[in-house]
Design a protein with these regions (language model features):
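Phosphate- and other anionic-substrate recognition elements at nucleic-acid/protein interfaces
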Residues: 2-193
């Protein structure tokens, strides 16, 4: 009796793209952490079917604090929601040790702007057509800061899906894909230096 042939390992590129498409096809809810006043506080924004709810300060039932942006990020990872937009931190002193510790959060400003526009939220003023900047950043190879050794195939796959969604006029889905790619791979969507 011959041994069964080993099952092929799943294609990580196809898996990530499928996960992204699933997230934007039926976004049950999503969470954004934000520091709205530069005082190291955080607010979680949850939306489902267009409804936006806010929760800030204190802790969640799972014990992850929402009073800091680091805690907000931990909450997003713990809850494992289908779409995570990111954290936007703004501080008066960009050279302070605290600011340096949350550099990945500070770089997510465009992600927060995009999420506001995506949810038609007025929680924070959003620059006109912020989604275009997000997609442009996603498409520009010199803006990618992924630690993966080979993100080219994934970038190409996401770009193809983005193009298809935009061609169909589905900007919301394209937005979700852009945010998914940025969050999952750690791409820098912040302003150019």
């Amino acid at each position: 009796m011959t041994a069964p042939s080993p099952r092929p390992s799943p294609d990580p590129i196809a898996h990530l793209v499928a996960r992204a498409l699933d997230a934007v096809a039926a976004p049950r809810r999503a969470v954004i952490g934000v520091d709205p006043d530069g005082k190291h506080t955080a607010v979680c924004v949850l939306w489902s079917d267009g409804a936006v709810d806010l929760a800030g300060g204190g802790t969640r039932a799972d014990g992850a604090p929402l009073c800091t942006c680091t805690g907000a990020l931990a909450t997003l990872r713990t809850v494992g929601l289908p779409a995570v937009a990111g954290v936007y931190v703004e501080t008066q002193n960009p050279h302070s040790p605290w600011s340096a510790a949350v550099e990945p959060c500070r770089r997510s400003r465009y992600m927060w702007e995009a999420a506001c526009e995506l949810t038609a939220s007025t929680l924070r003023p959003t620059a006109p057509q912020a989604w275009q900047r997000v997609l442009a950043k996603l498409a520009a190879p010199h803006h990618r800061t992924s630690t993966l050794s080979d993100y080219g195939p994934l970038a190409d796959a996401l770009a193809a899906q983005l193009g298809a969604k935009l061609a169909n006029g589905d900007q919301r889905a394209a937005f979700g894909l852009a945010l998914f790619g940025a969050h999952s791979l750690g791409w820098d969507l912040g302003p150019s230096a």
